[in-house]
Amino acid sequence: MLPIAILAGGLATRLRPITEKIPKALVGIAGKPFIVHQLDLLKRQGIEHVVLCVGYLGEMIHDLVGKGDRFDLQIEYSYDGPVLLGTGGSLKKALPLLGDSFFVLYGDSYLDCDYKKVQAAFEMNGKPALMTILRNEDRWDKSNILYQDGRIMKYDKKHLTPHMKYIDYGLSVLSKDIFTGIDKESVFDLAELYKDVVDTGRMASYEVSERFYEIGSRQGIKEISRLLEPKIMNMDGHQREERQDE
């Protein structure tokens, strides 16, 4: 399996005051820091090598996760430094740790799709980038992709139109070549690069059917907490949720 970069360096201002003293990756979900759930999922998916792109309070993530022994993963770190580089700049800086091609996952996303099939689609297509997409129709968040005839025709998070029925699922596979010409310490959003790659016809797509979960909002935290709460058996043999204290 390809290595995976997790973008976990943001300030998470939407979750204040929760994230005033901890990074978003350490927000408690169903009794564990979110990143523990995320790494457990990646291990189940066959991932072996993880690069954590960290910035704000990144040392706290390192202190918890370490080199990944408890997860049976190889984990390395790429630090933004004194200036936060944005999702794109942070990933650009991490390239020496990632090899020629790699998965990319946002640090607040829990995406339980088939990663092996996503990688196979990337390798079969031959384009330097692949984005997983979901037919969303504004259900889970605002749709930002115009998708027609098996192709991403337009990707734009700022200028949405009613014709956009799909959304960027949150998992991509990228070749390092799409970063050619971008300075190592550049500050930019990965969505800006994605838009350019789509506009120049270099972005492949892979449609998934599983919904995404995220901890970027309080509603998202409630939804993923319900998903991951431990289950216990009722007297009649049916599962019920073991509720956690809020």
Residue map of PLM features:
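A short, conserved acidic/glycine-rich loop-to-beta-strand motif
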Residues: 125-135
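N-terminal nucleotide-binding beta1-loop-alpha1 segment
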Residues: 1-20, 45
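Conserved N-terminal catalytic core of the sugar/cofactor nucleotidyltransferase
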Residues: 3-6, 32-106, 117, 184-185, ...
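Conserved beta-strand segments of alpha/beta enzyme cores
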Residues: 25, 74-76, 128, 202-204
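Short catalytic helix/loop segments, enriched in acidic residues and glycine
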Residues: 21-36
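Active-site metal-binding loops of divalent metal-dependent hydrolases
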Residues: 11, 108-109
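Catalytic-core segments of class I nucleotidyltransferases/pyrophosphorylases
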Residues: 102-103, 110, 116-123, 137-139, ...
